[in-house]
Amino acid sequence: MERASLTRSSINPKSNSNLNPDSVEFGYISGYNLRISCQNNISMTAYNLETLDGERYEAQMNLLFLHKLSEKFKNLKAINNIYSYIVKLIKEGNYKIISSPPNIVLVLQITENIENSNEIKIVLSSINRKYGNFKYLQEYLEILTNEIKRIKNSGSIVEKLENENKKLKKEVTDLKNIISSSSNNNLQNSKNNNININKNMIALDEFNKKFGLKIPNNNIKKLDLDNLNLGNEIIDYLAGMNFPFLEKLYIANNDISDIKNIEFFNYNNLQKLSLVDNKISDISALEKCHFADLKELHLYNNNIVNIKPLENSDFSKLQILSLGNNKISTIIFSKFNFVDLKALFLYNNSISDINTLSQCDFKNLEKLALNNNAIEEISVFEKVNFKNLKELWLYNNNISDIDVFSKAKFFNLEVLSLSNNNIENIKTLEKCDFRMLKKLDLGGNKISDITVFAKVNFNDLKELHLFNNNIDNIKILEKTNFDKLEKLVLNDNKIKDINVLSKVNFKNLKILYLYFNKLESIDVLKQTKFPLLEELSIGGNKISNISCLAQTNYINLKSLYLYNNDITDISILSKVNFPHLKILSLRHNKLMNISVLSNTNFTELNNLDLSENKLKEIDIISEVKFPELKELFLYSNSLTDLSVLKKVNFERLNILSLQENKLNNINFLEGVNFPALIKLYLDNNDIEDISALKTAKFPQLEELSLAKNKIMNISVLIRVNFPELKILYLNENKIKDISSLEKVKFDKLQILYLNDNLISNIQVLEKINFLELNELWLYNNNIEDINPLKKFKIGKIQVLSLFGNKIDKEKFANTIKSMQESIKNFQLTEVIY
């Protein structure tokens, strides 16, 4: 988690705290995604932004200043006016440019009186694509960078941007050569009709060598051009190509913003078109396209605002339309003619009004995704013909009233997701005809009364999600008729009493979540009849006694979560009958003794979590019989001696977590043979000597963490044989000398953390040969001389972190520039300084 907070930080405050207005050196921009941060001397607010992949990133904006500027325009949401104002300042020349490599800082002098502020500082910094893409700052960035190009006396910036454009054009040229060459008349006999192109295929001989393709244009059925950053030129180029049999075209993640020439695509047999992950805002060109056989159109993750052009498009056979994660606020389909449409995805937009859906014929629609919008009112469902709808996704909206479902006709509905809304009353479910419903998700609402479930007729229901509500009484479950229920999710409520579970008839139940409630006793479990139960989670309660588990009939149980309770005694585990148990979590309890594990019969156990307890020794682990164990978590205990690990035989162990204990040495690793170990965590102990690593046998080890210890000497790494090592954490130790890295053979090392040590000399960087290195973290050391960077065999490095040292800024800027000029394949995209 520490690494994530460092590498995914938008603009590190330390890197910009001492900007020198007189230092007008060449700023550093690389890549096509730039970070932006607005700041002044009043305040700075950090924001967490959540992306589709679930990761969270930090962006920094001066919210106070933007608010003041918005007040000037009498509209807090008039961001475009703010952009226009900033552009106006640039055009008028009210700016100066400073730098703190890799950042370019534009200081804009405010011409109007806005309280105490008299300037705006805008920091542009490079960002590698894998660290995220803040889409709602892109419009700002595009306007700004376009104006920068027009500014006189900023040739260095323009030059850099032009160089980036030249790279992009070269990729397009290479692509043209590849595709054009495939039309050679001598290549007529190949049966292969798919082309997949990636960045490594820039020459035709490499392309043919990789795929063995020798085909003319008229044979191609699938063309994959995803992730190439080809820009708008790829649309222009493809418009001139003739692929009469092309059925599938993928152009995702190519930095495309303009598709006006898509109307000239001569692909009469096209069935699937993917333009996802681009910067497209205008789709009016689709009105003129002739894709009569198109069945799938994917446009999610763009900047689309207006989808009205789709009304007039000739996509009569369209079955899947994906428009998620755009900027759509209005869904007008008054002339909607997609009568064969089966799936419509409009998630992650700004839609608040869906009444226009009543104008559409959705008689064949099976999936409708409107989640993650601002919808409050859904009465329109009463007017729409959804007779074939099977899945309706409405989670993460502002819905409070669901009475419409008692009037709407969803006879074939199988999935209804209403989680994370403002629903309190669900009594209307009694009147709903959900005869085919299999999954009902009402989690994350304000529901307290669930008595309605005694009156509903959901005979096919398999999943009921009621997590994160205000439920404290579940006695009504006794009167339900959920014979087919397989998953019951009741976590994060206020439930104290679960005695009703002994009376319910959930003979098909496989998953039961009761974690983070107010349970003190689980004795009732011995009276339950859940013969098919596979997963039981009762963590985060106040349970101290688990003896009832010995009397349960959970012979199919695979996962048992008992974490975050008050358990002190687990001796009962020797008597339970869980022959197929794969996951046992006892984390964050009060365990001091785990000797019972030697008497258990968990022969299929994969994951054992004993972290955050009070264990001082684990000698008994040498007697356990866990032949399938892959993950062992022992962090945050009081372990001092782990010599017992020399006696264990965990041939399949992948993860060993030993951080935050009281280890002062790692002698227990001498001669240890964990042939399948991939991750070893030893951080946050008192380790000084790591010489035992030289005899450890971890042929598959990819990640080793020795951070936050007392290590001074790392010369032993010369004799360490970890051929697959990719990530090494040595940060926050007492390391001064790193010269031994010259002889270290970690050929696959990608990330090296040496930050927060006592390093002053980095001469060794001239000699190390980590050709796969992507990230080098050296911040918060005593480094002054960075000349060795000029001879650094940079390989694939993309992130270099040096802030918090004693480096002269002017020398630093010159060094980075020198590195860039001397290395042809310069991939460094982020310098944190």
Question: Where do the language-model regions lie?
Answer:
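A structural signal for beta-rich interaction modules in eukaryotic proteins
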Residues: 2-119
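Conserved hydrophobic beta-strand positions in leucine-rich repeat
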Residues: 223-225, 249-251, 271-275, 295-299, ...
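LRR N-terminal entry segment and analogous cap-like coil->beta motifs
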Residues: 192-258
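A structural signal for leucine-rich repeat
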Residues: 236-242, 260-267, 284-291, 308-315, ...
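Leucine-rich repeat domain C-terminal region
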Residues: 775-780, 793-833
